[in-house]
Structure formats: structure tokens, C-alpha cells
Amino acid sequence: SEMCIRDRGITEFLPISSSGHLVIFDKLFPAINLNTNDIAFLHIGTLFSIVIFYRARILQIFSNLIIFKFYLKIIIFGILPAVIVGLFTPIQEAIDNSSQILIYTGIAYFFLSVLLIFSERIASKNILSIEEITINQAFMIGIAQAFALMPGISRSGVTLLAAMYLGLKKADAIFYSMLIGIPTIFGA
């Protein structure tokens, strides 16, 4: 499990699926046998690092009620699709129990990699700040985040791509991706 922790620490904020890594480690090294506590520990580290890195912006959000209400709204709409998919569909369980999980994970890695390669073309034309995001855009980014429930789809990568595709500047897309990651990762 130490190898998984090191891998997660190195790749967590790269647009690479950490759940995909866990699937691969589990299949290649079945003796590692990660349990729920190990995975929860990895999530806690992720949460702390997001909050610490963005602490100034997060405190700024909490310092103004109008700003707080706006961010609360776009966070709720940004996580709602993942909550619905995670709670009410058996897709995740079917994928996790599939004998073809390594193939699914590989296809997901490839698909997301291709999209990320072309993302820079999109990013150069983006002009929207996070304060200009609409509820519909937040929900669309949330739909993208729901796809990250599949191993091999990076949550940060797919939400970053969706936000940039919808016009957010890259820095704001990254911040929003991390912001909606806090409750999503906490819920996982």
C-alpha cells in the first residue's frame, strides 16, 4: 500500500485518474490488497492539500455572504450529477466487478489523454472568470465530473476540460475543478 500512497501523492493533481491507478495496482499486485481505510486515508490527504493550497481564496469566499451564496450555488450544481450517479446507479459496481476492468480503464485513460492533448487549443480563447459561471455551466461541469466515477477518468482532468470547453479561463477552471472536488472527494 505504500507504493499506492507514493503514486497517489505524485499524480493526485495531474489530470491522471488515481482510481485508475488503484485498479491497475490491484490487478497487477493483488497481494497489496488496499482496504477502505487506505483509500479513505488517500482521500483525506487530497482534501487537506486542496484546502491548504487554496486557503486564501476559500477564506475570501467565506468572508462575504453574497460571494458565499454564489459559490455555494455553483458548487451544489457542480456536484449534483455525481451525487445522483453515485447514489442511484449500479454503473460503478458493475464496472468495478467486471472482469474487463483493465480494458475499461485503459480505454478511459486513452480517451481522456486525447482530449487533454487538444485542450490547449480551447484554453487560449477562454475569457470567462469563475464569477461569470452560470448554473447551467456548473451543472454541465458536474455531468462531466459524474463520468469520473469510472476508473481511468480523472475527476480533475474531466472537470477542467469541461470548464475550459464552456469558456472558463484555465486558472479559474482549475480552481473550480478543485473547489467542487472538495465535497466530491469528501463524499467518496
Labelled PLM ranges:
Residues 19-38, 157-180:
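Interfacial segments of multi-pass membrane proteins
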Residues 27-123, 187:
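Membrane helix-loop-helix hairpins that form the core translocation module of multi-pass transporters
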Residues 66-73, 130-138, 178-182:
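Cytoplasmic-side transmembrane-helix entry/capping segments in multi-pass membrane proteins
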